[in-house]
Amino acid sequence: MILDKIFEKTKEDLKERKLKLPYDMLGRSLASNPFFPKDVIKALKRVEKEVKIIAEVKKASPSKGVIREDFDPLSIALNYEKNKATAISVLTEPHFFKGSLEYLSLIRRYTQIPLLRKDFIFDEYQILEALVYGADFVLLIAKMLSMKELKKLLEFARHLGLEALVEIHDKEDLSKAIFAGADIIGINHRNLEDFTMDMSLCEKLIPQIPNSKIIIAESGLENKEFLEHLQNLGVDAFLIGEYFMREEDEGKALKALL
């Protein structure tokens, strides 16, 4: 499965990064240049019919290959912010998504809205990295973590002042997210194991999610009417990447969905 390949490669990369910059040194770099994360819960919680979009900076994906040839992460991020994105998701996985932590750091320097580090996170070191490079919240994929691991990473993120978007794809993932104490739950219409899409997933899972949780819909979103349908089901915000990346003007495409 592709998820297993990505996970293994991420573990190799992390081992190298830890050798180059041990945990204590990474922590000291934060102490010398403190960063105070933004209130992600407040930003993402929907108010009436307001459309909230986490717009993604993504060059490639394992299922589609390179999506955006003329890829300028900062220009894209600034265009998103100018066109009223609620937050920006930054891919930092380098091999399959062609992302980088440097993109996250660069975008943080020039934007004011919350930033999501989107990667395959399974270690506290990666969460500390996210804070050092300027993220306000991190992605945690329920499918690739045990209940104990998910809970531990959630608690560590909060200890650092970060939030976590816990991504789910089925009832088992949802149970894991709820029992681990997730406040932000992302329902991914795309199955990460075979890339098939189930656009009815929100309808199936939202009735089982407590009202206190913030719900994010992910993948396959490119139609304003469908976004309104999902809002009526209880979705607070939408994470959209590939659709924007395929458009000539990603900011204009974003604005059209608001």
Swiss-Prot record:
Presence of the UniProt keyword Lyase in the record: yes
Coiled coil: none
Enzyme Commission number(s) from the entry: 4.1.1.48
Molecular function in Gene Ontology: indole-3-glycerol-phosphate synthase activity; phosphoribosylanthranilate isomerase activity
Pathway named in the protein's UniProt entry: Amino-acid biosynthesis; L-tryptophan biosynthesis; L-tryptophan from chorismate: step 4/5
Substrates-to-products reaction catalysed: 1-(2-carboxyphenylamino)-1-deoxy-D-ribulose 5-phosphate + H(+) = (1S,2R)-1-C-(indol-3-yl)glycerol 3-phosphate + CO2 + H2O
NCBIfam families: PRK00278.2-4, PRK00278.2-5
Recorded family membership: Belongs to the TrpC family.
Protein name per Swiss-Prot or TrEMBL: Indole-3-glycerol phosphate synthase
Chain's gene name: trpC
